[in-house]
């Protein structure tokens, strides 16, 4: 009894595998699906479809238009009328949502290595049904492309009926020809079909196509619910290659697609992945395996995965790894693992080579994920991975921390922030409720504010921009040059590709500030204009690691002491280099990647609760720095001397001892991956 339905399902499955190969062309924005010529077959289907849908036609159209970013299309031919409606406003979100990603990649071993060069035939779900005419697959989403040597048996030409084999005569029909011309053409086609059926061969028909039409399989990242997943689609792409002495004609099309898809970024990255299985809610491994790994393999990145087993393990891993085998370290974690990796590389005898060769980035799988939100503009693991694949290698400033207990042995590097007072205690003392995720920060801050606890100390500062007006001028001056000042890459407005594509405008994100308008990205076109010739200027040297203000030499004379009336009643002391310190906390809206300064924010513990309310409510927008009770400055270095007997510092979310802390900026020391070559736009210039 149970076998019969199973056989019927299998039979239907085999029949449903017959799919269409669609024609496409290359455009400046991506690969665009060509408008398909009408035929008696499609015309009859359209008429039948209209009759069956006449009673709900208006409803279906309204529903589609109001839910375009989340609409899922079925794979049968009854949707042709909807595709006609959508043709002018279609995008990659219109593709079928019925397939699931391949779960076979979810390895359970502690370490694994995946190299696509050894397994070039990875299988990804294909797109069900036709792609609407005028759909554009942006270069920013294309992961890989390759030629298909032979036409798959389960495909047929989208321009002909499913019962007829491929024929070049149909592909050459004008898109504007009328029904009579189509009928005449099909008569000729049927004659050709009878001959081909007699010889049982379709290869002769394929060879009659234009020599500039190639059958290509494209793997791209398609939105699925709140993520992106790799999908493949076979396309007949019309492309006439330019004359080239170093490219063969048959290689030119795929090479051109990949060049446009990976402009200004490294192809086939060699990635060393460090996963903290205990980070966040303990789901880092699952998030990486299901959300990130399929995209990395689809883009032909070679990856090696290791897992941390205890606090500080990533320091040892980075200190002992073979840096010649990799160009990127991806931390599938929160912000703690990038901190350990940076310091592990710093402790290497060949740290100069390590920081020159390797880019450090984050796949958000922890509680904070500030690095991903600031650099990739997203807290979503799959979108962050797509940005990792497509982003520009950029140098950012680091901060060097010195305390008496470890300064002589080895100073510590910080990429994110240092904090003392209310925020520090909240960050560290809520570790026991890590299972709550980011909500633990909000709960801890609210509890500490109600207590109005003071953290007396002495603070000495070397300012770069002391007042808020000076800071604003500094920000406006460096926003358009500081962040990409040292990038030797080439881009112009006529050939911008994925780097100006909004990866997240097709799904609702938890962080609304991640969504960027296309106009904002257009402003970056004139920023990325450096010459590739002098790449050695971007290399750091040993002297770049030299500390300008050693801890044992005392406080320099040009440093200013903060008013004791403020420092003795300190509520929050926070310095940082990235705009976000958590997915929903824009604490340093004026932070820039490489402006040579860090931001300092200070509050007074005596501030009333009624005045603290707008400060806290403005953290998600970054408007808290505009409040008169908040001190906001750009600084080059500082020293803070606590007066309490117990407490702690938090550096990049890690606990540091309560003893004098001295920090200075170290310009452009670390190489990371920034979307569009800059931090996420905080709109600080319009505040």
Swiss-Prot record:
Of the GO CC terms on this record, one is: Golgi apparatus
Q: Does the keyword Transferase apply?
A: yes
Q: So where does this one cross the membrane?
A: none
EC number in record? 2.7.1.91
Q: Where does ATP bind?
A: 276-278, 308, 340, 366-368, 434, 440, 652-654
* GO annotation terms (biological process): calcium-mediated signaling; response to heat; sphingolipid metabolic process; sphingosine biosynthetic process
**Which cystines does this chain contain?**
none
Q: Could you cite one Gene Ontology molecular function of this protein?
A: D-erythro-sphingosine kinase activity
List the keywords (alphabetical): ATP-binding, Golgi apparatus, Kinase, Lipid metabolism, Lipoprotein, Membrane, Nucleotide-binding, Palmitate, Sphingolipid metabolism, Transferase
Q: Where is the composition biased (Low complexity)?
A: 193-207
Functional summary from the UniProt entry: Catalyzes the phosphorylation of the sphingoid long chain bases dihydrosphingosine (DHS or sphinganine) and phytosphingosine (PHS) to form dihydrosphingosine 1-phosphate (DHS-1P) and phytosphingosine 1-phosphate (PHS-1P) respectively. Redundant to LCB4, is only responsible for few percent of the total activity. Involved in the biosynthesis of sphingolipids and ceramides. Involved in heat-induced transient cell cycle arrest. Accumulation of phosphorylated sphingoid long chain bases (LCBPs) stimulates calcium influx and activates calcineurin signaling. Involved in heat-stress resistance.
- What name does the UniProt record give this protein? Sphingoid long chain base kinase 5
Name of the coding gene:
LCB5
């Amino acid at each position: 009894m149970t076998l019969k339905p199973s056989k019927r399902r299998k039979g239907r499955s085999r029949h449903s595998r017959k799919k269409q190969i669609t024609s496409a062309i290359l455009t400046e924005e991506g690969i665009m699906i060509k408008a398909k010529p009408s035929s008696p077959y499609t015309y009859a289907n359209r008429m039948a479809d209209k009759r069956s849908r006449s009673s709900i036609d208006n409803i279906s159209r309204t529903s589609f238009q109001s839910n375009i970013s989340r609409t899922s299309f079925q794979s049968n031919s009854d949707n042709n009328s909807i595709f006609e409606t959508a043709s002018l406003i279609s995008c990659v979100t219109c593709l079928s949502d019925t397939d699931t990603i391949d779960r076979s990649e979810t390895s359970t071993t502690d370490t694994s290595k995946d190299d696509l060069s050894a397994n070039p035939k990875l299988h990804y779900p294909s797109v069900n049904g036709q792609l609407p005419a005028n759909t554009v697959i942006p270069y920013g989403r294309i992961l890989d492309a390759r030629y298909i040597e032979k036409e798959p048996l389960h495909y047929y030409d989208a321009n002909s009926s499913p019962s007829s084999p491929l024929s070049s005569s149909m592909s050459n029909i004008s898109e504007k020809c009328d029904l009579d011309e189509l009928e005449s053409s099909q008569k000729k086609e049927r004659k050709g079909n009878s001959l081909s059926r007699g010889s049982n061969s379709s290869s002769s028909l394929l060879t009659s196509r234009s020599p500039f039409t190639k059958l290509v399989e494209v793997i791209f990242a398609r939105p699925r619910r709140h993520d992106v997943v790799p999908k493949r689609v076979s396309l007949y792409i019309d492309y006439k290659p330019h004359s080239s002495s170093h490219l063969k004609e048959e290689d030119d099309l795929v090479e051109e697609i990949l060049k446009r898809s990976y402009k200004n970024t490294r192809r086939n990255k060699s990635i060393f992945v460090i996963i903290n299985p205990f980070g966040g809610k303990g789901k880092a491994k699952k998030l990486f395996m299901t959300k990130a790994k399929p995209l990395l393999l689809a883009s032909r990145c070679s990856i090696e995965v290791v897992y941390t087993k205890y606090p500080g393990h990533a320091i040892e891993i980075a200190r002992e790894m073979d840096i010649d085998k990799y160009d990127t370290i991806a931390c599938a974690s929160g912000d703690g693992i990038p901190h350990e990796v940076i310091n592990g590389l710093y402790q290497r005898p060949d740290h100069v080579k390590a920081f020159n060769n390797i880019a450090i980035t984050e796949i958000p799988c922890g509680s904070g994920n500030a690095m991903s939100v600031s650099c990739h503009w997203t807290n979503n693991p799959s979108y962050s991975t797509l940005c990792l694949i497509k982003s520009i290698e950029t140098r950012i400033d680091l901060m060097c921390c010195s305390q008496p207990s470890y300064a002589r042995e080895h100073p510590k590097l910080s990429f994110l922030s240092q904090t003392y007072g209310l925020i520090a205690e909240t960050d560290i003392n809520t570790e026991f409720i890590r299972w709550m995720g980011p909500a633990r920060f909000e709960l801890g801050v609210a509890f500490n504010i109600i207590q109005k606890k003071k953290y007396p100390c002495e603070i000495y500062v070397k300012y770069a921009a002391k007042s808020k007006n000076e800071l604003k001028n500094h920000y406006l001056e460096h926003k358009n040059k500081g962040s990409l000042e040292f990038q030797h890459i080439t881009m112009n407005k006529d050939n911008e590709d994925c780097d100006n594509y909004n990866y997240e405008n097709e799904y609702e994100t938890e962080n609304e500030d991640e969504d960027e308008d296309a106009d904002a990205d257009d402003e970056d076109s004139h920023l990325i204009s450096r010459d590739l010739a002098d790449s050695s200027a971007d290399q750091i040297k040993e002297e770049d690691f030299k500390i300008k203000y050693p801890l044992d030499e005392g406080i320099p004379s040009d440093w200013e002491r903060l008013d004791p009336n403020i420092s003795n009643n300190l509520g929050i002391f926070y310095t940082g280099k990235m705009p976000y310190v958590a997915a929903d906390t824009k604490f340093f809206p004026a932070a820039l990647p490489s402006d040579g300064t860090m931001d300092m924010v200070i509050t007074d513990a005596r501030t009333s609760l009624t005045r603290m309310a707008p400060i806290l409510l403005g953290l998600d927008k970054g408007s808290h720095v505009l409040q008169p009770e908040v001190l906001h400055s750009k600084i080059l270095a500082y020293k803070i001397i606590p007066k309490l007997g117990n407490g702690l510092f938090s550096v990049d979310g890690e606990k540091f001892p309560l003893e004098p802390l001295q920090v200075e900026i170290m310009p452009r020391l670390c190489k990371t991956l920034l979307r569009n070559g800059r931090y996420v736009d905080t709109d600080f210039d319009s505040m």
